[in-house]
Amino acid sequence: MKKNLIYLIVSGLLSFNLFSSDSSLRPGSGVYEFHFFNVTNPEGFVSAIEAFDSSSCAAKWRNESGANVGLYSRMGGGHSHIILVAYENYDMMQLGQNIFASCSASSEMNVAFANTSVSEDYYNYVTELVLEAGDWRLNTVFSNIEVKVKTGSQPSYLEAYKQLTNSTGDAFGSYGINRVVYGNKYVSHNVV
């Protein structure tokens, strides 16, 4: 598992998947937890993830809630890594959070995270995918641009985003815009 995670991180830094089969912009689906870390001990951080991943709790969590998890390195912004947890909908996220919170293995991983990262730098938020094009699961490199859209201006912002993406054609692989539904007062959307 450790070699696989390291391979994914390295290949993510070195490769680009620029084209996907469906580049038309459409309504998105899914609910996403973004967890931002400033990791000081990458090996210990990944080891904590591996220990949790090999637990019966992790198996139950994924099997029952459909949680899909990714670890990404990040450049800029004061955080070195993102853990992204994707769920099909809010009900599955709630089920996943309940299972995750009930396990000693997840508590042990969180303690290890505190020992391998700057805990006061940690933050998270939950988003819902508003618009998407292509299949982001096929990409290995992402931009994650966080923006604050003025309250009441989301429709015009989304229209401008559609115009931008329509004007670029197939220049991107996959892209989309997420609305932050809770967890962060500084960011209202993230563009990926």
Question: What are the functions of these language-model segments?
Answer:
Residues L18-V192:
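Short S/T/G/P-rich N-terminal loop/turn motif that feeds into the first structured element of a domain
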Residues M1-N4:
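Positively charged n-region of N-terminal signal peptides that target proteins for export
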Residues Y7-N17:
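Bacterial N-terminal signal peptides
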